[in-house]
């Protein structure tokens, strides 16, 4: 696509509902350590947390941001569930969290620390966007769903898959207050790593683009 000089391609050329990147969701072996890297090396700040203290005993997530760039770093608290005998802790895992825990361990085994979800911010009807994506070949991963946080409104999201193990969540925050936690189930963080007071600020504006790597000779098939 050729864009004339000084012409803004957003949002009209990519669809009226598309706003930009909402966040990049990583699966990592050590979320706290990964968050520390982005905070101390790239000027990110911690903005939200999910873990045992917030009602997520099996998974931990740290959310870090630098201006318009937001990363979610998620990792397991315990080993993978299995078909054999399990201790009492693993036997208590609800089916949904069991599936997510197994997925994260498998992703880490195959890829190491890496991106799982490139999430897009959507304005408007997510149901229509999701249906259009699926009708044009996207895999239906999670149908549109609405989550609420008392006092902060609601957030609508859905997820599709394109190729490989990476997925794309569609997120509508139009009725979700700006001072709300990152997502339902998360807790706001406003503390800073003391080392950042000794480091120069790094000003990142936003995520410009993400590249989906393909195996040798695999690009043509994906494009088709």
Regions found by a protein language model. Give the residues of each.
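N-terminal beta-strand motif that seeds the catalytic metal site of vicinal oxygen chelate
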Residues: 2-32, 115-118, 181-223
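Domain-wide signal for the mature, well-folded portions of proteins, strongly enriched
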Residues: 138-140, 154, 165, 210
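A structural feature that tracks compact, well-ordered secondary-structure segments
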Residues: 37, 63, 74-76, 119-121, ...
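Vicinal oxygen chelate
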Residues: 19-29, 62, 84-132, 159-160, ...
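Generic marker of residues within folded, mature protein domains
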Residues: 14-16, 54, 108-110, 150, ...
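Conserved short beta-strand elements that form part of the metal-binding/catalytic scaffold
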Residues: 2-10, 42-108, 154-188
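Short secondary-structure capping/junction motifs at helix and strand boundaries
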Residues: 126-145, 167
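Core segments of cupin and vicinal oxygen chelate
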Residues: 25-71, 135, 144-151, 158-162, ...
């Amino acid at each position: 696509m050729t864009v004339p000089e000084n012409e803004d391609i957003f949002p009209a050329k990519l669809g009226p509902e598309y706003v930009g990147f909402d966040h990049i969701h990583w699966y990592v072996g050590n979320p706290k350590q990964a968050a520390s890297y982005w905070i101390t090396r790239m000027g990110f700040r911690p903005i939200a947390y999910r873990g045992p203290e917030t009602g997520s005993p099996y998974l931990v997530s740290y959310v870090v941001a630098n201006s318009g760039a937001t990363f979610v770093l998620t990792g397991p608290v315990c080993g993978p569930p299995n078909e054999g005998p399990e201790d009492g802790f693993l036997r208590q895992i609800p089916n949904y969290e069991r599936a997510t825990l197994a997925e994260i361990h498998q992703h880490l085994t195959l890829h190491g620390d890496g991106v799982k979800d490139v999430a897009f911010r959507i304005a408007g009807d997510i149901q229509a966007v999701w249906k259009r994506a699926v009708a044009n070949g996207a895999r239906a991963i999670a149908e549109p769903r609405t989550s609420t946080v008392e006092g902060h409104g609601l957030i609508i999201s859905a997820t599709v898959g394109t190729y490989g193990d990476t997925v794309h969540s569609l997120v509508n925050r139009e009725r979700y207050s700006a001072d709300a936690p990152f997502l339902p189930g998360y807790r706001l963080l406003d503390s800073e790593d003391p080392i950042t007071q000794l480091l120069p600020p790094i000003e990142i504006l936003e995520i410009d683009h993400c590249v989906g790597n393909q195996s040798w000779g695999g690009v043509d098939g994906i494009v088709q």
